[in-house]
A protein has these predicted regions:
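Active-site hotspot residues in diverse enzymes, especially metal/ion-binding acidic/histidine motifs
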Residues: 1-308
Length: 308
C-alpha cells in the first residue's frame, strides 16, 4: 500500500493520510506542496566512492526539505545579491586560473582566507551545515528554483575539512554546474585543484615553504587552516617533495593516526554559517512572525522549526 502511494499509483484515504502525517510529524500542508524535487550534485560521489543508494536518497530528500524552507523564506526577504563567477575550463584555462580569478573578483586579499563561509555567503550563496548521516559524504551543492546555489557541508567534520569541502563545492559551482562537461574530464580533480589554489595560492605557498616534515606541515596547517594531508599533497603536485618523501611522510602520518585525526594542537575551529539563521530571525524579529506562523509558512511543526 505505502509503496504504491509513494509511487503515485494509489491515493491515500483521508484516514491513512492523517496517520502518515501523525507518524512523520508533518502537517498536511507539507504534503500538499507542489515543489519539484531537485537532484543535487550526486553523480560526482557515485564516480568517487561507493555509497548505499538509500543513503543517497535520504540525503537528497533532506536536502530538498532545507531547499524548500529556504525558498519559502525567500518570498519575504532577499538574500545578498548573487555574485557567482562562472568559468569554462575548456575556454579559459585550468582550475587554478579559475581560483585566482575568483579571488580577484571577490577581492580576497593575499594570504590565508580567514572565513571562507562568510565570503561565500556575502556573495549570495547559502551555506548549510548538514547531517548527511554518513561520514563518506563531505558536501554537496544544489540550485534553488530561483537559481540560488546552496552548499551543504557535513557538520560532523573538523574545521579544516569543512573549509576544503566548501572550496571544493564552490569549484563545482564555478566550473561545472549547468555546463556541458566532456566525460573525459575529471571534475573531482578539477574541483580539488580549484579548492587548493583558492585556499593556498601556489605562489605564496612556495615562497614560505621550508623543508617538508610533519612539524612544518603542522605549522602550515595552523596558518592556512587546511589539513596536513592536503598541504602535503599540494607540495607533491608542485614538485616540492619526491615520490619517496611523499610516501614516507604519508606512512608516518598513518602510523601516528594522523590520516584519521590530526594533532589537536593544530585543530581548526569550524566556521559558522549565518545566512539561513539570519533569514529566520528576520521573520520573527522584524517581520513579526510568531513561531507558529513561521512554522505554518514553512509547512513544518514548531519542534522542527526550533531545530533549524
Amino acid at each position: 500500500m505505502l509503496s504504491k502511494i509513494e509511487k503515485g499509483l494509489n491515493k491515500p484515504s483521508e484516514e491513512i493520510f492523517t496517520t502518515i502525517c501523525n507518524v512523520l510529524e508533518f502537517p498536511k500542508s507539507f504534503f500538499e506542496q507542489t515543489n519539484n524535487i531537485f537532484e543535487p550534485n550526486l553523480s560526482y560521489y557515485r564516480k568517487r566512492i561507493v555509497i548505499k543508494k538509500r543513503d543517497l536518497l535520504k540525503a537528497e530528500g533532506s536536502m530538498n526539505l532545507v531547499r524548500m524552507n529556504l525558498e519559502n523564506l525567500m518570498t519575504s526577504v532577499e538574500l545578498p545579491e548573487l555574485n557567482l563567477p562562472l568559468w569554462d575550463v575548456d575556454v579559459h584555462g585550468a582550475p587554478e586560473a579559475a581560483a585566482k580569478w575568483v579571488r580577484q573578483k571577490w577581492r580576497i586579499p593575499k594570504g590565508r582566507i580567514e572565513n571562507l563561509t562568510k565570503i561565500i555567503e556575502d556573495n549570495g550563496i547559502v551555506v548549510v551545515p548538514f547531517d548527511f548521516g554518513s561520514e563518506k559524504m563531505d558536501g554537496l551543492s544544489l540550485i534553488s528554483k530561483d537559481r540560488h546555489p546552496i552548499i551543504y557541508i557535513n557538520n560532523k567534520m573538523p574545521g579544516d575539512r569543512q573549509r576544503l569541502t566548501l572550496a571544493h563545492e564552490l569549484g563545482h559551482l564555478v566550473m561545472h554546474i549547468g555546463q556541458q562537461i566532456a566525460q573525459i574530464r575529471n571534475v573531482e580533480k578539477e574541483a580539488m585543484q580549484f579548492a587548493s589554489e583558492l585556499l593556498v595560492p601556489a605562489s605564496e605557498f612556495l615562497q614560505d615553504l621550508e623543508t617538508i616534515s610533519l612539524e612544518t606541515l603542522g605549522n602550515m596547517k595552523r596558518y592556512w587552516k587546511i589539513s596536513m594531508g592536503a598541504l602535503l599533497y599540494k607540495a607533491k603536485e608542485l614538485a616540492q617533495v619526491t615520490d619517496n618523501q611523499y610516501r614516507y611522510l604519508w606512512q608516518q602520518m598513518a602510523y601516528l593516526g594522523y590520516k584519521t585525526k590530526e594533532p589537536a594542537e593544530f585543530n581548526v575551529s569550524p566556521e559558522k554559517a549565518t545566512l539561513f539563521k539570519e533569514m529566520l530571525e528576520l521573520h520573527t524579529n522584524e517581520l513579526g512572525y510568531t513561531k507558529d506562523e513561521l512554522a505554518n509558512m514553512l509547512h513544518i511543526n514548531v519542534k522542527d522549526l526550533n531545530a533549524l
